[in-house]
């Protein structure tokens, strides 16, 4: 008889996750007023915040990868090769502006072709138009509002065996949108802000990991002092001899102080965080 003491218990397998940033320009277009290969970028802290929240809730960091599509501008063939090789179970796309719609269509189609059974989840500003996104693209789920809590809830759903046939289990989860069997939008309301909300300091090693074989592009996260204009010089510390010629920027708030009637912001109001 087999000695059961020597049998290792079967542990639940964590799904592999790839988080991606998307360009705001349409496929095939160039930036009109800047060289896209040299333009300064602000780190997409929303993507990092999702990663940090998952890790803070005991999700293995090694199960999360990052692909900076916005910075790399890979071809369709390069994207397909990446996803076939990486083979994540869940791909999270970040669309910071509605301008990213055509990129969402492009990238999600490539993912669906390469990985027919994977989940494609969209977050960011574009999810204000979740009905259009879900009906006109192959995106499976939209995360509306602050994404940390609902994305974590979605991961838990997948970990316990949830499938596209049982997605109705998520109908009461705030911040999660999907289409039911009749093609109607299911949305129970905006997500709540994460507990102990904070905006992370940029993790440049994380952002560098998304640059694949072009780690030197991380330099584009640092803006030359001369590009800041006269405002920077108002601080006398800027004239200290030990100062380096580049500046890193980071966010200290969420939302916007404006109340434009035409804006579809998911983050309601203006919140200063730690």
What residue ranges belong to the model's regions?
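Glycine-rich beta-alpha loop elements in corrinoid/cobalamin-binding modules
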Residues: 50-53, 62-196
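A short, charged/proline- and glycine-enriched loop
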Residues: 10-16, 243-246
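Radical SAM [4Fe-4S] cluster-binding motif and immediate context
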Residues: 42, 205-274
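Conserved alpha-helical substructure of the radical SAM core
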Residues: 2-5, 74-77, 86, 242-243, ...
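Short catalytic helix/loop segments, enriched in acidic residues and glycine
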Residues: 35-54
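Short glycine-rich His-centered loop
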Residues: 15-40
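Conserved glycine-rich "GG(E/T)P / GGGxP" loop and the immediately following alpha-helix
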Residues: 37-39, 94-102, 266-274
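Short, glycine/serine-rich, charged loops/turns that create anion-binding
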Residues: 24-26, 71, 127, 255, ...
């Amino acid at each position: 008889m087999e000695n059961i003491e020597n049998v290792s218990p079967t542990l639940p397998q964590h799904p592999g996750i790839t988080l991606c940033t998307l360009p705001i320009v349409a496929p095939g277009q160039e930036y009109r007023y800047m060289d896209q290969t040299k333009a300064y970028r602000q780190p997409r802290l929303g993507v990092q915040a999702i990663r940090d929240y998952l890790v803070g809730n005991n999700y293995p960091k090694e199960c999360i990868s990052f692909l900076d599509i916005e910075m790399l501008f890979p071809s369709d063939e390069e994207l397909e090769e990446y996803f076939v090789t990486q083979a994540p179970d869940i791909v999270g796309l970040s669309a910071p502006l509605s301008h990213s719609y055509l990129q969402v269509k492009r990238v999600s189609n490539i993912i669906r072709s390469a990985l027919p059974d994977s989940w494609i989840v969209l977050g960011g500003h574009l999810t204000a138009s979740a009905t259009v996104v879900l009906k006109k693209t192959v995106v499976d789920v939209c995360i509306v509002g602050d994404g940390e809590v609902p994305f974590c809830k979605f991961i838990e759903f997948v970990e316990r065996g949830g499938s596209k046939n049982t997605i109705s289990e998520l109908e009461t989860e705030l911040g999660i949108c999907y289409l039911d069997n009749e093609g109607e939008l299911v949305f129970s309301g905006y997500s709540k802000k994460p507990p102990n909300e904070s905006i992370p300091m940029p993790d440049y090693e994380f952002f560098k990991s998304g640059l694949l074989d072009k780690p030197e592009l991380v330099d584009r996260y640092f803006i030359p002092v001369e590009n800041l204009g006269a405002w920077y010089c108002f601080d006398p510390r800027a004239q200290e001899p030990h100062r380096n010629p580049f500046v890193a920027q980071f966010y200290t708030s969420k939302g916007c102080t404006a109340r434009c009637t035409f804006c579809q912001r998911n983050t309601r109001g203006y919140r200063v965080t730690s």
